[in-house]
């Protein structure tokens, strides 16, 4: 689907991510620039943008460059923000209003021209509020022709932290956790419950889909399956965005992470990536 106007395509977790406040601060900043959310796949970027648009604007329009190739032609041909907005309004069937409509560009790494166009929104149409998001943006950010240097705000989005995890999985316990004052003694019953919740967090992690599954089913096997699928998605992305030359070494580095973290020595060991491995073999892949 090319766009969506109001409804969320799927509910990840009915809870407030801390990053929502960062988005509110961005909206209220008089020197606001188009905002680019950076982060790995499935950390909740799309959910955040739509939730923000739904609750803090009169309307939002959503465009996904990964789902509709024809959308890219608008940015390949046009550089004028007003013309782009006219065409986007025709596509979504809604008038895009300055300050009242949040414009969302998702998977923007699939259209470097759209990423570059953000500088024209900053220069010529900054009254329009634009948020873009993408995964593996590093390769584009390293290319000055694709990246609008100094013309966008950047915000890194990460998996849910323990506070967000607790808020989603046990609101009552979170209320207690949030009320704890510095150096306050924690009652044993709550200490044990918080410790159990933290142990669950270490196993489940902070990926929103995993947390949502845990909230709905409390089934470790379901969570483990989702985790395996996410790892597979990441591994497939390596070859998609970095080319065949580097993808093999990137994959080797990625698969060595658990072994690296398990070592008592905190220094990264290239030999754990591949027997006889040297820095010059994997430095580029790590970067």
Residue ranges: model-predicted function:
Residues 1-28:
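N-terminal pre-Walker A segment at the start of P-loop NTPase domains
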Residues 2-11, 167-287:
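Interdomain hinge/linker elements that couple catalytic modules in large macromolecular machines
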Residues 45:
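Conserved lysine of the Walker
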Residues 48, 52:
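Hydrophobic positions on the alpha1 helix immediately C-terminal to the Walker A/P-loop
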Residues 56-71:
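Conserved catalytic segments around the Walker B and adjacent sensor/switch elements
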Residues 67-99:
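Short glycine-rich substrate-engagement loop in P-loop NTPases that contacts/grips substrate
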Residues 104, 129-135, 156:
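Structural recognition of the conserved hydrophobic beta-strand(s) that form the central parallel beta-sheet
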Residues 138-154, 166-171:
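Short regulatory helix/loop adjacent to the ATP-binding pocket of P-loop NTPases
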């Amino acid at each position: 689907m090319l766009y969506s106007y109001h409804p969320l395509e799927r509910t990840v977790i009915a809870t407030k991510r801390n990053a929502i406040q960062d988005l509110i601060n961005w909206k209220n900043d008089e020197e606001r620039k188009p905002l680019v959310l950076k982060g790995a796949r499935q950390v909740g970027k799309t959910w955040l943008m739509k939730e923000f648009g739904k609750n803090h604007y009169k309307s939002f329009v959503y465009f996904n460059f990964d789902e509709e190739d024809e959308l890219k032609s608008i940015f390949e041909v046009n550089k004028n923000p007003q013309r782009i907005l006219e065409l986007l309004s025709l596509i979504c069937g809604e008038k895009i209003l300055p300050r009242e409509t949040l414009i969302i560009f998702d998977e923007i790494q699939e259209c470097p021209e759209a990423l570059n166009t953000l500088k024209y929104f900053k220069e010529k149409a900054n009254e329009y509020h634009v948020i873009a998001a993408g995964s593996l943006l590093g390769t584009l950010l390293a290319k000055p022709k694709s990246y609008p240097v100094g013309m966008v705000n950047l915000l890194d989005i990460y998996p849910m932290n323990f506070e967000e995890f607790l808020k989603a999985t046990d609101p009552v316990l979170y209320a207690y956790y949030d009320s704890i004052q510095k150096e306050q003694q924690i009652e044993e019953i709550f200490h044990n419950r918080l410790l159990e919740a933290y142990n669950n967090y270490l196993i489940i992690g902070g990926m929103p889909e995993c947390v949502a599954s845990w909230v709905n089913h409390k089934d470790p096997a379901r969570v483990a399956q989702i985790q395996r699928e996410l790892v597979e998605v990441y591994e497939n992305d390596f070859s998609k965005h970095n080319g065949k030359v580097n993808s093999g070494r990137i994959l080797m580095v990625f698969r060595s992470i658990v072994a690296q973290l398990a070592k008592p020595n905190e220094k990264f060991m290239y030999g754990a990536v591949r027997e006889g491995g040297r820095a010059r073999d994997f430095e580029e892949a790590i970067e």
